[in-house]
């Protein structure tokens, strides 16, 4: 999970070593099913010439695929500086480094420029204030917001509780959260976005919303 309670916990958990592991996995297997869904959801509404902003983008795999698909530029805002070196190397390898910008900081509190598309993949699950995070996303998104989250059910809440207990015993500040999906979606809809596609199965659920509100399928 690429998310956390605060910068210190994030940097501790998502280290340079973790970034290298993710790069190796991407090089050998490509995008995960959930990440591929995110890319496809963005492409469904058109990516050619668009700008993309991804808080918590990690090694930038989703951004790389969107840039390859025709996006004009992308920006990744990442809490952990440990991802930068590996991510920049991967972007150079993919031939998109000149079109990808990376910043270190809290997306919900920085001055990042707006973009056509905002992606929050595996991020809201561990940000304590989902209203603040998604509120920042809709302020920045001109056209589309896509986000993924773990299902809020007995099994997932028990699992996240066990993970948080383990982290607490280790003295880690990293935490995960199972925010209510309906309330998260309402934050985005309140800003004038309407859902157009869902990801309903798997560990990561997802929803994509657009300002034009052409309807959910």
Annotate each predicted stretch with a short phrase.
Residues 142-151:
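Conserved beta-strand signature within the Rossmann-like core of class I S-adenosyl-L-methionine
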Residues 156-173:
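Short, glycine-/aromatic-enriched active-site segment of Class I SAM-dependent methyltransferases
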Residues 127-137:
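A short, conserved alpha-helix within the catalytic core of class I
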Residues 1-46, 50-58:
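Conserved class I S-adenosyl-L-methionine
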Residues 117-129:
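A short SAM/SAH-binding and catalytic strip from SAM-dependent methyltransferases
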Residues 59-99, 104:
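Class I SAM-dependent methyltransferase SAM/SAH-binding core
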Residues 174-192:
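Short alpha-helix
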């Amino acid at each position: 999970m690429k998310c956390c309670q605060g910068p210190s916990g994030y940097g501790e958990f998502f280290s340079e070593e973790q970034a290298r592991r993710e790069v190796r996995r991407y090089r050998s297997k490509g995008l995960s099913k959930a990440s591929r869904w995110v890319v496809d959801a963005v492409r469904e509404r058109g990516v050619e010439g668009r700008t993309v902003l991804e808080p918590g983008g990690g090694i930038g795999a989703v951004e790389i695929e969107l840039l390859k698909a025709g996006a004009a530029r992308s920006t990744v805002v990442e809490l952990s500086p440990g991802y930068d070196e590996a991510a920049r190397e991967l972007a150079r390898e993919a031939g998109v480094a000149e079109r990808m910008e990376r910043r270190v900081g809290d997306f919900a509190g920085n001055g990042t420029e707006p973009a056509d598309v905002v992606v929050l993949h595996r991020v809201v699950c561990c940000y304590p204030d989902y209203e603040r995070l998604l509120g920042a996303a809709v302020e920045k998104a001109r056209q589309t917001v896509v986000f993924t989250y773990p299902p809020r059910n007995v099994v997932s809440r028990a699992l996240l509780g066990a993970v948080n207990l383990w982290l607490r015993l280790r003295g880690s500040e990293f935490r995960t959260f199972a925010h209510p999906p309906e309330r998260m979606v309402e934050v985005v809809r309140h800003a004038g976005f309407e859902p157009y596609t869902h990801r309903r199965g798997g560990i990561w659920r997802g929803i994509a919303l657009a300002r034009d509100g052409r309807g959910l399928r």
